[in-house]
Amino acid sequence: MASTADFKNGLVLQIDGQLWQIVEFQHVKPGKGPAFVRTKLKNVVSGKVVDKTYNAGVKVETATVDRRDATYLYRDGSDFVFMDSEDYEQHPLPESLVGRAADFLLESMPVQIAFHDGVPLYLELPVTVELLVASTEPGLQGDRSSAGTKPATMETGAEIQVPLFINTGDKLKVDSRDGSYLGRVNA
């Protein structure tokens, strides 16, 4: 059990037999009335996001989530195979569980897998990943009417928006949470 004062992003709650992860939370102290906590919760299994409000100080049931370090090995059909860094056990995770993270996975990449009662719940990638640009069109300075970006296909197959000066073969830092360009990697 945890109080609303213990809320933090990433905390997993057990509500009506389902697991919900706190994506955002905000403590609100209005001028009149009692304080409350506004949360945005994501269902760990389905990915559905809901808003829920709790009175301040309310006790909620938390789920025990074990985060284990692992390494991405290879793709086997629709499964992604990871090796636990502690006991070297291999864990095949279905494509539905890996989700958008599949766009940024490289072989031998360190990741974290969250387990609840021995069942994998979700995958956490490093916030920034370094990827090579597999292909992109040459960007010309005068050929745009808006911001200077163009699509680029990365070595993993992900397509992201990059500045016009990026060329095929460049190594880039990419935010794995939203697929945004962060910068070039200096060689």
From Swiss-Prot:
Molecular-function GO term, any one: translation elongation factor activity
Disulfide bridge positions per record: none
Subcellular location per the Swiss-Prot or TrEMBL entry: Cytoplasm
Pfam families recorded: EFP, EFP_N, Elong-fact-P_C
Example of a GO biological process term: peptide biosynthetic process
Pathway(s) this gene product operates in, as recorded in its UniProt entry: Protein biosynthesis; polypeptide chain elongation
InterPro entries cross-referenced by the UniProt entry: Elong-fact-P_C, NA-bd_OB-fold, Rib_uL2_dom2, Transl_elong_fac_P/YeiP, Transl_elong_KOW-like, Transl_elong_P/YeiP_cen, Transl_elong_P/YeiP_CS, Transl_elongation_fac_P
Primary location: cytoplasm
GO cellular component: cytoplasm
Superkingdom, taxonomy of origin: Bacteria
Keywords in alphabetical order: Cytoplasm, Elongation factor, Protein biosynthesis
NCBIfam families on file: efp (TIGR00038), PRK00529.1 (NF001810)
Known function: Involved in peptide bond synthesis. Stimulates efficient translation and peptide-bond synthesis on native or reconstituted 70S ribosomes in vitro. Probably functions indirectly by altering the affinity of the ribosome for aminoacyl-tRNA, thus increasing their reactivity as acceptors for peptidyl transferase.
Family: Belongs to the elongation factor P family.
Protein name as annotated: Elongation factor P
Organism: Mycobacterium sp. (strain KMS)
Gene transcribed to yield this protein: efp
